Amino acid sequence: MGRRRPPDRAPVLLNCFREVVGEVSSDRPVFIGGKSMGGRIASMLLNELSSSGAVRAGLCFGYPFHPFGQPSRVRTEHLEQLKAPLLILQGERDPMGCAEEVSRYDLKPPLQLQWIPDGDHSFKPRKRSGRTEEMNCDLAVELADQFMRAVLA
């Protein structure tokens, strides 16, 4: 079994994202996004890629507002400069940005934040919540669909 490696550094990931978007046909609306760090990288490129017309908006599933266990190291500076729509779907109990912590951040449109009930970083709820992971994933899909339809309207 192979050893788990950390992800590439941000400059490598940013360039990879740019390359992939550059290969996508522009005859249809393009949305970028990702889970956790992938969503963060997409959000960091959103202004650049939307101003060039390459993408319409972004989606983040479980945004890492701060490193695990380090709530004072907030990663929101670039979010304050957004010009294109961005939807962040976040579990209420996400250890990298729970509802209580994130409610104190100064997040404004065009950023939209939607909470996944009792969800952790992967949207998994506790059993006692009465929700299931499937319910939360279905909700995330529904919210993402509504967001994309609104952007395209």
Task: Please place each PLM-identified region on the residue numbering.
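Serine-hydrolase catalytic machinery in alpha/beta-hydrolase-like enzymes
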Residues: M1-F31, D120-G130
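Short beta-strand immediately N-terminal to the catalytic nucleophile in serine-hydrolase-like folds
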Residues: P29-G34, F61
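Gly/Ala-rich beta-loop-alpha elbow adjacent to hydrolase catalytic centers
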Residues: G34-A42
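Hydrolases whose catalytic domains are alpha/beta-hydrolase-1, hotdog thioesterase
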Residues: I41-L45, G69
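A conserved short beta-strand
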Residues: S52-F65, G69
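Short beta-strand/loop motif that positions the catalytic acidic residue
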Residues: Q81-K83, I88-Q90, D94
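Conserved alpha/beta-hydrolase "acid-adjacent" motif
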Residues: P95-E101
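Catalytic active-site module of serine/aspartate enzymes centered on a nucleophile-bearing elbow/loop
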Residues: K127-A153
